[in-house]
Swiss-Prot record:
Residues 1-77, 96-191, 276-416, 455-480, 617-710, 723-762 are annotated as: Disordered. It comes from the Eukaryota. Up-regulated by cAMP. It comes from Dictyostelium discoideum. This is RGS domain-containing serine/threonine-protein kinase A. RckA kinase activity remains elevated unless the stimulus is removed and the kinase function is directly involved in delocalizing the protein from the plasma membrane. However, the membrane localization does not require a functional kinase domain and seems not to be essential for the kinase activation. Its main location: cytoplasm. Residues 121-136, 690-710, 736-748 have a biased composition (Basic and acidic residues). Residues 7-30, 37-66, 159-191, 281-342, 362-416, 617-685, 723-735, 749-762 have a biased composition (Low complexity). It is found in: Cytoplasm; Cell membrane. SMART domains: RGS, S_TKc.
Length: 1125
């Protein structure tokens, strides 16, 4: 070619050979000693068709010449697919400067393409590595191929590989010259005159027909002093998209080039290149190459100075890239990374938009010239010293470009981007559906914020709410009764108050501390030394032994002290532990008890305060809840302040006979004082009229959203109107009569008084006994629902509610219909029962589990570990907002030690979340099946008792769980039972139930067959859980193909082990009876289990538990434990 002649003539100049080398390298992409082979391919329709295509080839499919196409025989292929991180780690490794270090030939199997692509290698074992076979480091130009016997299109067997320079008559440098040149210039020249930086291992692996287009990948290992910039890879990954193809999850510098006229590949080549390495040489139009060569020849003949060499480079750039610049044409300032770390795009005009954006970072050489760029010449040229400084650059146009390259490198590093990990694009981790703030574990400090002391900063709104709440708490007067040790001793001494306090502990907390205190109290009364020793051992076994179910939380030093005193027990041996627990009980449990409805004294004080402040100013003792026919005590309660803004004042009447008394509603007249009685009645009537007007005026109320809601108080209004009519009759009867008819007048007024008493009693019943229904009819007057509890005196279901403008709560009685109505009002958002929490106040730590019902995360709220359950249309398979509200309502208003308490709930867009206390030991299902957990028989009884107590409380609240199973029972760090998942819970109503609710293995037979079932379905589920607890196995084989509903409906049950304790097997059999009425209630189950766990308590109460547990008398409604004879 003309190029070779001009190249020899221009060696006298400094760097003219640079251009000639660049021009000659246009057609040497196929010149890597025939190491790779290719075949003509057509686009496959699926990835499976790739197995028949050899994808290790040169860029254009040329095997032995610069034009034309070659083919190779197919064969058994294997795919290598590794992660992207493997590829990154490979690039970051130090350069292999000795080719003998490779124990396998290129392409090296430990290197993969990443990005979901595969390298297809020949299944034949490779030949032993020989230095002469290395296409880069070897200078002999071996014609052998690593692919074995590859047949070209022209014939079979191995064929020698010839470069374009050899075919055109160009004389190549010999091995010694090239090796010397490599040593001096720290560069390597291959047989095709391609120049590579020493220490850079380059392999060209064209990927064919993946994603409906052929691609070429060049992977290389850059030297350690030039690490790869991963950020640019991420930017390529994020922006790269190729039409009509599968999505590219990563691409390293792809650009499209027109294929050679002689190539058989129809689709455009997509060239992928790593950073800081030499790009692939693609074959371009020969006409353009010849033009470039002629330009370089003319320039080289006219260049005699160093600056002429720069003009030569400028000419090349002007003809190809239209970059009319000086030395800076070879480099372009980049704001993202240095030129060593930037991809090089060969054809920016035909590349996709994302490629054009990134290709602007680098100035390429001519469009038709796609050669490696570091230039060198023979030793006689004298140009080596001028080009050594340009090794850091991809393109070195002249010896004078070193300064411009340095300037570019300085400009490149102006903006340093923060390193980002690749998990954002190449990770299978679930993203958080709600942007909770991350938990700052690495800081190890708690962030102080305005709303709480936690890991999350609060906003201004939460701070304002907190200040309002604290201000409101300061306004509320403290309870009159104080929690002191003397008061506590007095409480547990009285049997009535002891039962009330025990009921409070059962509903809110555990009874270990209280039971220990009572046992020690009994222990101190024993005088017999033998009995004292026996009682001491029993107390140790119950409260201090490591296997004790009711073990106390005390220090090990105190346990050792008690253990040492067991040999010679004294009455004072438990004093240290008793003082410690006494402080805990008084400061925690007893303090909450004295201000709770369980305390009879607090209830009486509350009634007095409520009556004096709201209804009357009298100083007489008033009992609002007891109505008698005696008119003197006829002081009935009235609706809250919301119904009437002005309370009725007592009329001042002079009673000579003390027969007339004032009332909120009416006052009776006296025959001996007609005028005064009439005035009193008229005064009371005027107050009633005023009250009636106030009630009618408040019938229209506006809520926070500006929507008007009417208040329906027809019952109250009708009673008030009837009372007013009675008052008017009383006044008319007491006036206009003569003194001689006083007796008749007295009878008339007495009748009116009786009418008043009857009407007052009816009103009292409406307000006290059945008034909660009226509250539900106007739910906007409810400020907060505090809790629902069982009254310890009359065992009646009660609810504590705070009404608008009231500081103290009001207690109402409930029935099943009221409970159902309450839940419906909560679902309608008319009543709020939970604490509203902003997602920014919750910090998230880690993912726990995901399922069809939502996702669960572990996080922190106000410095406490919480479980965060996230639900929503995008998170749940079947999301029901009403079910979510119902679950939050039940978990918020029910307070029990064995029920998971909802700490609050919130919303973010269309996703919802609620917080519960975090249970470290997971579900009971997984805990039982983990064989590493050593679970004693006592611990299993503890599990059974905790579940029974929680379900006893739920059933007492008229709630059916309907999905009771071991997966919905969690264990805290101290293995305390917590029942969760109240989404399917319903108010006990046997006439309106949904069939097939729950999990089949735990479902009662009546659920499959009928819609009319009761709370006994939970008892059946409890029997299956007992089977799991005491066998540590599933009730039904999970792998067996069995029809559980048919088995259950036929009366078939899991087989109980023969070595199971009789007391346990009997209760299981009784709980899964086919007929629901034959199953025991949880009240009886709890009593029986407690008699097993606490035999000394049962003995001290005079009760003995039945050993058979199969007697029908014990389950037919009688008490479970029978008294001693």
């Amino acid at each position: 070619m003309k190029t070779s002649k001009d190249s020899s003539n221009s060696n006298s100049n400094n760097n003219n050979n640079n251009n000639n080398n660049n021009n000659n390298n246009n057609n040497n992409n196929n010149g890597l000693n025939g190491t790779y082979s290719s075949k003509s391919l057509s686009p496959p329709t699926s990835p499976k068709q790739m197995s028949g295509n050899s994808i290790i080839s040169n860029s254009t499919g040329n095997l032995s010449s610069g034009s034309g196409s070659g083919s190779s025989s197919g064969g058994n292929k294997k795919f290598i697919n590794r992660s992207f991180n493997t590829f990154i780690d490979f690039i970051k490794k130090p350069a292999r400067r000795n080719s003998k270090a490779h124990n396998t030939p290129p392409p090296y199997p430990e290197v993969d393409t990443g990005f979901g692509y595969f390298l297809e290698l020949d299944s034949k074992p490779p030949k032993p590595f020989d230095e002469k076979d290395d296409p880069i480091h070897n200078s002999t130009g071996s014609t052998d191929s690593w692919e074995g016997d590859l047949n070209s299109s022209g014939g079979g067997g191995k064929q020698p590989q010839q470069t374009q320079q050899q075919s055109s008559g160009e004389n190549l440098n010999n091995s010694s010259d090239r090796n010397n040149n490599s040593n001096e210039n720290n560069q390597i020249v291959d047989d095709n005159s391609n120049v590579f930086n020493k220490g850079v291992v380059v392999q060209t692996v064209p990927m064919t027909e993946i994603g409906l287009f052929p691609v070429s990948l060049m992977m290389a290992q850059q030297r350690a002093e030039h690490p790869i910039n991963v950020e640019d890879i991420e930017s390529d990954v994020q922006t790269c998209s190729i039409p009509n193809s599968k999505p590219l999850y990563s691409s390293l510098g792809c650009s499209t080039n027109s294929s050679n006229s002689g190539s058989s590949i129809s689709a455009p080549n997509i060239t992928f290149q790593s950073f800081g390495i030499s790009p692939v040489n693609n074959n371009n139009n020969n006409n353009n190459n010849s033009n470039n060569n002629s330009n370089s020849n003319s320039n080289s003949n006219s260049n005699s100075n160093n600056n002429n060499n720069n003009n030569n480079n400028n000419n090349n750039n002007n003809n190809n890239n239209n970059n009319n610049n000086n030395n800076n044409n070879s480099t372009v300032n980049s704001n993202n990374s240095s030129l060593n770390n930037s991809p090089r795009y060969l054809n920016s005009s035909s590349s996709p938009r994302s490629m054009q954006h990134l290709s602007s970072k680098i100035t390429t050489t001519t469009t038709t010239t796609t050669t490696t760029t570091t230039t060198t010449s023979d030793d006689n040229n004298g140009n080596t010293n001028n080009n050594i400084s340009n090794n850091n650059n991809i393109i070195n146009n002249s010896n004078n470009n070193s300064n411009s390259n340095n300037n570019n490198n300085n400009n490149i590093n102006n903006t340093n981007h923060k390193f980002k990990t690749m998990e954002k694009y190449f990770s299978s981790k679930e993203n958080f559906p709600i942007p909770f703030p991350k938990l700052k574990d690495e800081l190890g400090v708690i962030i102080e914020n305005s709303s709480n002391k936690g890991y999350v900063g609060g906003n201004k709104g939460s701070e304002d709410r907190r200040k309002k709440i604290e201000q409101k708490k300061k306004q509320v007067p403290a309870p009159e009764m104080k929690a002191t040790k003397e008061k506590f001793i007095e409480t547990i001494t009285d049997p009535t108050t002891l039962n009330s306090f025990r009921s409070f502990m059962e509903n809110t907390q555990s009874n270990e501390n209280l039971e220990f205190f009572l046992e020690v109290k009994r222990f101190n009364t024993i005088q017999d030394q033998v009995l004292l020793k026996h009682t001491c051992d029993d107390i140790w076994r119950r409260f201090f032994d490591d296997l004790a179910v009711t073990q106390l939380c005390v220090e090990s030093s105190l346990k050792k002290l008690i253990n040492n005193r067991r040999e010679n027990p004294t009455h004072s041996m438990f004093n240290e532990v008793l003082d410690l627990l006494l402080d805990d009980i008084v400061c925690d449990a007893f303090r909450n008890y004295i201000s709770s409805p369980f305390n009879p004294e607090w209830k009486s004080e509350f009634k007095k305060k409520f009556t004096n402040n709201t209804y009357s100013t009298t100083t007489q003792p008033i009992n609002n809840f007891n109505n008698t026919n005696n008119n003197n005590n006829n002081n009935c309660s009235t609706p809250p302040n919301n119904y009437s803004s002005s309370p009725i004042k007592q009329s001042n009447i002079n009673n000579n006979n003390n027969n007339a008394s004032s009332s909120n509603i009416a006052s009776s007249s006296n025959v001996n004082n007609n005028n005064n009685n009439s005035n009193g009645s008229n005064t009371s009537s005027s107050h009633h009229r005023e009250r009636l007007d106030n009630i009618k005026g408040n019938r229209e109320r506006v809520d926070s959203n500006g929507k008007e809601r009417s208040i329906d108080n027809k019952d109250i209004l009708s009673l008030l109107e009837s009372n007013l009519s009675n008052h008017s009759n009383s006044s008319s009867n007491s006036n206009g009569k003569d003194k001689d008819k006083d007796k008749d007048k007295n009878e008339n007024t007495t009748d009116n008084s009786n009418n008043n008493n009857n009407s007052n009693n009816n009103l009292n019943n409406l307000i006290i006994k059945n008034n909660f229904n009226n509250i539900l009819q106007s739910p906007q007057i409810v400020s907060k629902i505090n809790e629902i509890f069982k009254d310890s005196n009359n065992s009646q279901l009660s609810i504590s509610i705070t009404l608008d403008n009231d500081e103290d709560p009001t207690i109402f009685h409930l029935d099943e219909s009221d409970m159902e109505s309450l839940i419906e009002e909560v679902v309608k958002d008319n009543i709020s029962v939970h604490t509203e929490i902003s997602y920014s106040d919750v910090s998230i730590h880690k993912w726990i589990a995901s399922g069809s019902s939502g996702r669960v995360y572990n996080g922190q709220y106000k410095g406490k570990d919480v479980a965060i359950k996230v639900l929503g249309p995008e998170v749940c398979v079947h999301f029901d907002l009403n079910e979510f509200k119902r679950e939050v309502a039940l978990m918020s208003i029910f307070k029990h030690d064995n029920l998971a308490r909802c700490l609050g709930a919130g919303q973010y867009d269309d996703k919802y979340f609620h917080l519960t206390e975090y249970c470290h030991n997971g579900s009971l299902f997984s805990y039982l099946r983990d064989q590493r957990n050593n679970i004693s028989f006592g611990q299993r009884l503890h599990f059974a008792l905790g579940i029974a107590r929680g379900m006893r409380y739920l059933h007492s609240m008229s709630i059916i769980h309907r999905d009771l199973k071991s997966m919905n029972i969690l264990l805290t760090k101290r293995l305390k039972i917590k029942i969760v998942d109240f989404g399917t819970s319903r108010v006990a109503n046997k006439y309106n139930m949904t069939t097939h609710v729950g999990t089949q293995a735990w479902m009662a037979p009546e659920i499959f067959t009928s819609r009319t079932y009761t709370n006994k379905v939970d008892v059946y589920s409890y029997a299956i859980i007992l089977f799991e607890i005491f066998t540590r196995k599933s009730a039904y084989d999970e792998n067996a193909n069995i029809n559980i509903p048919n088995m259950v409906m036929k009366g078939e049950r899991p087989e109980l082990p023969k070595d199971m304790q009789t007391s346990i097997s009997n209760i299981i059999k009784k709980c899964w009876q086919q007929k629901p009425s034959n199953r025991p209630s949880f009240i009886k189950i709890v009593a029986y289990l407690e008699s097993i766990i606490y035999p000394s308590v049962s003995n001290s109460l005079g009760l003995v538990a039945s050993t058979s547990f199969s007697s029908s008398a014990l389950w037919s409604g009688q008490i479970l434990a029978q008294p001693k004879n």
